[in-house]
From Swiss-Prot:
This is Protein nucleotidyltransferase YdiU. The active site is at 252 (proton acceptor). Its cofactor is Mg(2+); Mn(2+). GO terms for molecular function: AMPylase activity; ATP binding; magnesium ion binding.
């Protein structure tokens, strides 16, 4: 396997004009140590776990040491935050070290989050804390295992360097990987400055690098915008189907590649609640779970607006017009598969009514769908393990009769259907209380075994893993008091 020093850097973004970024080196931290790592993410760089046994590697992932070929920069962008335009944001604590080209020819940008102050820190200290870094690490890799497009997390490195939030905490850095960290806000900043050429130049770069099939078009920009909208629709369908709530869907947190980007106060549904707000700071519920598809549509209008200098308003509007239908198709296809049904018009009422039952009875979303895999289509009034989840069992029985009839009409044997459904409905998700338990052990005892255990468990979310059965249970009562916010 390779070493960090042997990696081939091909820093495409850093070859753009400095209009798009500022060159800045990470600020060192004292006595860095390894908290956790992802073997799967390491392999994207042709590295294995032995590389993390080298002190030089930990120093590099702490931002204390730059390697030949690295070109450290912080990216400029703007964005709409909670619906209001903020003219300059940028990487306030993240520093892009460079882009590695692996043996498969894939480009992976390496970014350190929590690497210190940059010209875009806006008075912040440029640091991230251990708790938020562990959360981002665990969720990035868990989302990948759920087959949801996401940035990746290679490792978390900690330091006893104090960081002050509500209380004194300790610093940490997450090594993040992505083909690109370009966001909707990367274009918005130049639109609001009335600078057309930087918009065009950035669009040309993104198309050449990540949408090369569009290069042959006489006018690639409308199709580029259309493709971004379709990727965004697919991502929203995946979030909604798995019960993931991002928490801060500002336009600066929207990936131009349709990746899940910037894990902050996220949360997965426990009891099914369409209006679930995972971010304690979101007092108005703008980014509530059931609002996410519409927020993404609104964010796309802001991207379209930013690209209007490259096309007419009508063309930009047309380019994103397919989003509602694309989202609807993708969401129905995923939900139908989770219910073991074909995605037809007759499937919609069954799914909609089931979700209403879940909401009315405060039934755990993930547990219900996993138990649904074992539904006996021949026993209309049976299925006791599933039925026992509901307070209104008569309502469940009525729905179960309809569902059983639909399954029988579908004609697939129960055992075959159950096996397929178990590949669509995870048994294990990153519940907030599981992350909290791991973080407490890490912060209080410097014991990272629970972080490692959770990472290994969530790398196989669809498998039974009977030794970890307790991790699939409903959250305890104390977990309902956990609050997460943008503070990290």
């Amino acid at each position: 396997m390779a070493t960090l020093e042997s990696l081939t850097f091909d820093n495409g973004f850093a070859r753009l004009p400095e209009t798009y970024y500022a060159r800045v080196c990470p600020t060192p931290v004292p006595d860095p140590y390894l908290v956790c790592y992802s073997p799967e993410a390491l392999s994207l760089l042709d590295l294995d776990a032995t590389e993390l046994k080298r002190p030089e590697t930990i120093e590099t992932l702490a931002g204390n040491r730059l390697l030949p070929g690295m070109d450290a920069i912080a990216a400029l962008y703007a964005g709409h935050q909670f619906g209001h335009y903020v003219p300059q944001l940028g990487d306030g604590r993240a520093i892009l070290l460079g882009e590695v080209r692996n043996r498969a020819g894939e480009g992976w940008e390496i970014q350190l989050k929590g690497a210190g102050r940059t010209p875009y820190s806006r008075g912040g200290d440029g640091r991230a804390v251990l708790r938020s870094s562990i959360r981002e690490f665990l969720c990035s890799e868990a989302m990948h295992a759920l087959d949801i497009p996401t940035t990746r997390a290679l490792a978390v490195v900690g330091s006893d360097h104090p960081v002050y939030r509500e209380d004194e905490e300790t610093a940490a850095l997450v090594t993040r990987l992505a083909p690109s960290f370009v966001r909707f806000g990367s274009f918005e900043v130049f639109y609001y400055r009335n600078q057309v050429e930087p918009i065009r130049h950035l669009a040309d770069y993104v198309i050449a690098r990540y949408y090369p099939e569009l290069k042959t078009l006489a006018d690639p920009y409308p199709e580029f915008l259309r493709q971004v909208s379709l990727r965004t629709a697919e991502l929203m369908a995946q979030w909604q189907a798995v019960g993931f709530s991002h928490g801060v869907m500002n336009t600066d947190n929207m990936s131009i590649l349709g990746l899940t980007l910037d894990y902050g106060p996220f949360g997965f549904l426990d009891a099914f609640d369409p209006g679930f707000v995972c971010n304690h700071s979101d007092t108005g519920g703008r980014y509530a779970f059931d609002q996410q598809p519409d927020v993404a549509a609104w964010n796309l209008t802001k991207l379209a607006q930013a690209l209007v200098p490259l096309m007419s308003v009508e063309t930009a509007s047309q380019a994103i017009s397919e989003y509602p239908q694309a989202f609807g198709r993708a969401y129905l296809a995923r939900m139908a598969a989770k219910f073991g049904l074909a995605p037809g018009d007759d499937t919609v009422p069954l799914i909609t009514d089931a979700l209403q039952l879940l909401a009315g009875n405060r039934v755990d979303y993930t547990i219900f769908l996993r138990k649904l895999c074992a539904f006996d289509s021949q026993a209309d009034a049976g299925n006791a393990p599933l039925r026992d989840l509901f307070l209104d069992r008569a309502a469940f029985d009525a729905w179960a009769v309809r569902y059983g009839a639909a399954l029988r009409q579908h004609g697939q044997p129960d055992a075959e259907r159950a096996a397929t459904m178990r590949t669509r409905n995870p048994k294990y998700i990153l519940r907030n209380y599981l992350a909290e338990n791991a973080i407490r052990r890490a912060a209080d005892l410097r014991d990272y075994s629970e972080v490692e255990r959770l990472h290994r468990l969530l790398a196989r979310p669809f498998d039974e893993q009977p030794a970890f059965e307790a991790y699939a249970a409903e959250p305890p009562d104390w977990a309902k008091r956990i609050e997460v916010s943008c503070s990290s």
